[in-house]
Amino acid sequence: MAEANQLFKEFKIQSVSEFFRRNAAMLGYTGKVRSLTTLVHEAVTNSLDACEEAGIPPYVRVEIEELGNEHYKVVVEDNGPGIPEKYITHVFGKMLAGTKAHRNIQSRGQQGIGISGAVMFAQITSGKATRVITSTGNDEIIEAWVKIDVDKNEGKIVKKEKHPNPKGWRGTRIELEVKNVKYMRSKQGVFWYLKLTAIANPHAHIELIEPDGKLIVFPRSSDYIPEPPVEMKPHPKGVLTDDVYRLAKKTRRNTVRRFLIGEFSRISDKKVDELIEYIAALRLIKTVEDKKLQEQYYQKLMEGHVKAVLRAFKGYTKVVKQVAKMMEKPPEKLTWHEAEEIVEAFKYMKFLAPPTHGLRPIGEENIEKGLKGILKPEFVTAVTRPPKVYSGGIPFQVEVGIAYGGEIPAGFDLYRYANRVPLLFDAGSCVTTQAARSIDWKRYKIDDLDRAPLVLMINVVSVHVPYTGTGKQSIASVDEIYNEIRLAIMDAARRLQTYLSGKHRKLAQVKRRKTFEKYVPEIARALSILTGEPEEKIREYFIRFIESKFASAEVEEVAAEEVAENA
């Protein structure tokens, strides 16, 4: 039998970077077109987030240069706040590092993998370092070539130069050389990604230089810069035991009571007193041997009758005092079991819904501006639903835009977004697709959806978008999100229905008018023979009569539409 030491001779600890190097497909680097789009997406996402957090109207320029067969140089430049020199290796060379991953805050990137994953993909396909040029607007520009040490999950600068900055340039430019990718103008390519990004971010000016040198500009159509999202405290209904235990070890609060009030939303002194009772009640219920009676107590607790449950046990005040004492000890001394008790009690308690002030939707006006500016439709409308929560305590918000006709070609298109970021892949498994296809579009005057000149835009906003995978291209089918998407679509579709109904009525009126006008000459000729009146005079009379009748009908129709809109 082999010895244990021999069996474990090949045992090796794998770094996060090494894991993702071997599993790049998990980050979206699968397929030649998709890999290039993913790489551009990660860089553009970083640029937009940085500009908005600094209150700067984003200017993003993307250049794709073909160096050989399936071999490109990708350049992304922005006018953001720049990156301090000491953070360059962390931003571009360390997985699970960033300004967002550890915060309960809405952002385009959430996992701290994005741009460093792009650097790694470029490195493993071309062997080249990523060139970074950046300045915070001070007197120097930093030029650095960054590589990732996959064994240590660390970035390293293989070459660095400093240049004077007499004009005070501020921003970041990155150049990545990448192989085994392909540029195509498909609906999964870079052009399409930037087009959809421009629609959801009308405050951004975006430029693309394609491999053939063609310049495409998506101009800024709104001067409004979204306010930076606000970090939100975790809600009691959305936390795990590990969350409470880990936060307790890190907090600066001096008691468990102060910790709970200060680190979580919707917890006050009064709520902590209530929590004490629930924990005490749960401790007492677990001492009951009769399972049927135990279930009855749990049911009463779920209904909020905590005091009645406590009074059912002799000496319950002693247990309440023990729990109250726990609330006054230092948080760092909180045990795992005590954290479990707190989270279990949370499940039975009632809390106000989490605050939603930290969510930053695009907004109805800006959705309409984005759709009009890029698609040039004949009709556009947008709906932003009120914030809701899923999984008991995670806030989210759904927005929908509909664009119809005009320069939109025949054929239904669904534009999917999460926190303003286009989702181009894995549409079949996405809750947005499922919700859109569940709608009976015929009710809204769309008889053949697949041939209609219709674009449906759906944006899901949340501090934690429930993606189906690390590639972040598909949103999981969560009931609360699914229902909100359906409600938003139906609201917008009713407005489209009103527009199409009016359009159909007008077309019918035009047809009727042409029918009447067609017979005017013949009628005028016959009446002229019968009455002796001039034919021209009779013809003019009938034309004026038809015009007055249809004009009054149009006035009545406009009035009816106004009443319907205000109803």
UniProtKB/Swiss-Prot annotation:
ATP-binding is among the record's keywords: yes
Entry keyword set: ATP-binding, DNA-binding, Isomerase, Nucleotide-binding, Topoisomerase
Spans traversing the lipid bilayer: none
Enzyme class name: isomerase
InterPro entries according to UniProt: HATPase_C_sf, Ribosomal_Su5_D2-typ_SF, Ribsml_uS5_D2-typ_fold_subgr, TopoVI_B, TopoVI_B_transducer
Single Gene Ontology MF annotation: DNA topoisomerase type II (double strand cut, ATP-hydrolyzing) activity
Entry EC number(s): 5.6.2.2
Residues the record lists as binding ATP: 46, 78, 99-100, 109-116, 472
GO CC, any one term: small ribosomal subunit
Tagged with keyword Oxidoreductase: no
Reaction equations catalysed: ATP-dependent breakage, passage and rejoining of double-stranded DNA
Gene Ontology annotations of biological process type: DNA topological change
Reported function: Relaxes both positive and negative superturns and exhibits a strong decatenase activity.
Quaternary structure and partners: Homodimer. Heterotetramer of two Top6A and two Top6B chains.
Family the UniProt entry places it in: Belongs to the TOP6B family.
HAMAP family for this protein: Top6B
Name by which UniProt lists this protein: Type 2 DNA topoisomerase 6 subunit B
Organism, as annotated: Thermococcus kodakarensis (strain ATCC BAA-918 / JCM 12380 / KOD1)
